[in-house]
Amino acid sequence: MDTQPIRLPSVAGATRSAGYPTRPPLRRFLTDCHEEFRGDSSGELADYIPELKRANPDHFGIALVTIDGHVYEVGDSAVPFTIQSVSKAFVFALALETVGEERVSATIGVEPSGEAFNSIRLTNDNRPFNPMVNAGAIACSGLIYEVDGKGAFERVRSKLSEFAGRELGVDEAVHASETATGNRNRAIAWLLRNYAVLPDDVDAVLDVYFRQCAILVTARDLAVMAATLANRGINPVTGAQVITPHIVARTLSVMTSSGMYDYAGEWTYRVGIPAKSGVGGGIVAALPSQLGLGTFSPLLDNHFNSVRGLKVCEALSARFDLHMLNRNADVRTSVMADYDVYGISSRRSRQPHEQQILDERHSDIRIVELVGALNFGTIDYVTRRLTSEPPNAPLLIIDFRRVPDITAAGAELLGETLTALGNANVTTILSGLEEASAVWAAIAARTGDPRRLRRFALLDDAIEWAEDQVIYRFGGFTDVKESVHLGEQALLAELDTDEIAAIVKLSTTRHYTAGQRVIAAGAPANSLFFLQSGMVSVKLRSGVRLASLGPGMEFGEMAILERTRSADVFADTPVACLELPLDSFADYRRLHPETALKIMRNLAAILARRLVAANAKVDLLSAY
């Protein structure tokens, strides 16, 4: 095998035309790889199994599956071939699942052998070197046979089918050919039996092994199987949890050290992606959390690896810098924002005395927004930032809405930190987490008493709850059931008693029950409302809450400026309010122009405050 760096195909630019490009860049790259390497006819067909020598040397297929289940296919990706030694990785995973890690480790080692894959040799303690050589693979089949007996192969075929996301069959001709010519494997099996690694029925175990090698797959199947390993054991196409993350890690480890026969060291150096090859011409490569790759080309090099498949893997890794040991993640990027509520607030509108408390005590509420999948390194940084950096706010909100996953180690560190914060009288509120969230489940399971944690699905709800605590602690609590005098309405500020009485005379008292719609989006805007008691929410048609209003506040006031309602308003509690028709208000403006001017100035001030608050939020987000 030529070990000099290969020439990488360039990512060809798409012809410019109206509309979006028809092919994603990754598909164009894979197509270029196929065009670049299909002319390479070096290598030989496997001949030690006669049936494999019948393969078409021109076949060349590439498939790549992302962990969100998108499938790229180029060339002969749907041509079936026998899985051969690629099966070893997945049967090893099945053995771990079937008999447990302790039993597998006692039977099979995990060290590279330094010898040919079909060497008739064991370690000094009479174990196969690893599950990727024939001796180790046969031992794996033996472990499964001990549990399932005659059903062992069906268990293997069924599990590999789960990995592939479809039912897989067997090439009976290849199975017969392997059985007829597999004397070297028989020698290995009897050596294993001599040291009690295999049960008595050696021939039955060998038949399981020969059959698993003769399972028919395509390059697409291999890519899906690899992506399942890359996706922590979840098949990204079917969504099924095929194997546990713990077993995935052990499987990928052995694939890294021993998966590419005696080219494994060079492979790790050049490509750096856990992989397994087979003499049928297949290669499977799994890059954790990113992709699964499957290639098929039956021409093999002197290490029994597919010539074209190797070149595809090397080109992909080099072009997109996919080597697993060349990672550039910065733990500091896990904190998207860290701020208090100075200049910002929840969507809950506050009375002036309440807002004054929040303005004075803004540093009592700290908000930390996290982003990305969280692991040991990122959570260590987050926990140090939470516990060692000022300000030491009594109310801490940690937002997880941009966090798709957290590892067990990360959840362990975070759980300990949340417990310590609780013991230090810090009230911790977690937002962006639904009840059924896996992230919430992982954190709650590792927190001393999860009942001490407050959890909200939305960050705004968490901020509103924290604001309520600050207001209540400093004597500003408002009972929404109590009616507020109209003179406390911001829209009617500076109006005297007679002017307010005139407004009341033009208005009608309305009552609404909790959940009742008060204003419908799209309806004519022909009145405005003064909320006397209760709570209402202003929502878009999508259900997104724009504001929450309490006693002493107005809503529907934009009717003064526009004629169509832009949002819904719902009563959150029993509500009492005054409705002022716009026609009546228009008459009032003509009769009392100076009073109307005060109201319009108040409306301008209200809108200005909203704009300032919106700008503060934009500035905050722009700072991170």
From Swiss-Prot:
Catalysed reaction equations from the record: L-glutamine + H2O = L-glutamate + NH4(+)
Enzyme Commission number: 3.5.1.2
GO BP field: glutamate biosynthetic process; glutamine catabolic process
Domain of life from the UniProt record: Bacteria
Region entry Glutaminase, spans: 43-325
Enzyme class: hydrolase
UniProt domain STAS: residue ranges: 355-466
Residues that, per the record, bind a nucleoside 3',5'-cyclic phosphate: 491-608
Residues that coordinate or bind substrate: S85, N134, E178, N185, Y209, Y261, V279
Matching SUPFAM superfamilies: beta-lactamase/transpeptidase-like, cAMP-binding domain-like, SpoIIaa-like
Stretches the record annotates as Disordered: 1-20
Keywords, ordered alphabetically: Hydrolase
InterPro entries per the UniProt record, alphabetical: Beta-lactam/transpept-like, cNMP-bd_CS, cNMP-bd_dom, cNMP-bd_dom_sf, Glutaminase, RmlC-like_jellyroll, STAS_dom, STAS_dom_sf
GO molecular function: glutaminase activity
UniProt xrefs under Pfam families: cNMP_binding, Glutaminase, STAS
Disulfide pairings: none
Similarity field: Belongs to the glutaminase family.
NCBIfam families named in the record: Gln_ase
Subunit organization: Homotetramer.
Family annotation (PANTHER family): GLUTAMINASE
Name of protein: Glutaminase 2
Organism: Bradyrhizobium diazoefficiens (strain JCM 10833 / BCRC 13528 / IAM 13628 / NBRC 14792 / USDA 110)
